[in-house]
């Protein structure tokens, strides 16, 4: 049985921190493969600045030569045209694709807080959260100022599955932050973010004149 991580984000663009985070998580959680899952344009909860094709190409360039990493087109192709790209569907897809392996959804502690946030109306919490938590596993990355154990203890749903198997908490060494928004803004202002993302991606952005206009972030 292998161990697989699914790392979803807009990757607009992919940064060195995305790659470092994936590598660190793979090492600590002993993953055999990490799938980078770019979000599709058209999602109701995310506004992408570049096309699916550009973000796909940058990811392929970024991970080239690393057998641990792979890019998945599940959201940008198989669920293209739908705004309801819920995590439940994504995890069911990967679980069906790798039925003999353990599949983990990789997320930050901020998303853990959102799954069953008791301060939000029920209809604003994650869709299908009960069966998502009951049937899947998660690797949760620490975020500054967020107490992951407290989040779990405050949610009846999360607390019910706090069995040492559902949630793999990584609470140290992942606090470095370089946001894609910052890199986009640097490009828009004529800055030089060359060393914040892979060389091939930097050159791709320059060649294709991406992120050239002032952005509202």
In which residue ranges do the predicted regions lie?
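Nucleotidyltransferase catalytic core that binds NTPs
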Residues: 1-217
